[in-house]
Amino acid sequence: MGNKLSSVWSKFFSKKEAKVLMLGLDAAGKTTILYQLKLGMNLETIPTMGFVYEKIEHKNFKLSVWDVAGQDALRPLWKHYYQNTKGIIFVVDSSDEKRMSLAKEELHKILGDDEVKDAALLLLANKMDLKVMTPKDVENKMEIDKFQNKKSKTFGVVGLTGEGLTEAMDWLADNM
């Protein structure tokens, strides 16, 4: 009896574990967002070389978040992180219209890979405080509608302050 009760208890009250990749072009704000999620504060960051790994608890999940560098020379390495990924957070600098088509191209490469076909996609339109593009503008530029079978949602966020991140992560946790 004790084992059954323990099993039921852990099923409903223990946290599920999930691997999440945080990807996007360099200078999109991935590491700033990661530390805002982890610590609830803005830390001064430097460009990521390789990856940053953090464990974050959100809702009923223990998330293993891999923030992978977005520089041109390092993007081909992204695919080596895909295995067992349950969620993808793709961060876009909404103030950088010049690189929006490049961001779209990289996102479509990711979404075209079978290893992440079942992963939920959280598209973060970062730097909303600069008021250049709306989250819907970013979503349209990323042509997310081409992936109709993909669980995805776009949120406008401000990585420096954390604005919008709780709602975005709630959606991700509910859809993984």
Outline where the language-model segments fall:
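TRAFAC-class small GTPase G-domain
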Residues: 1-176
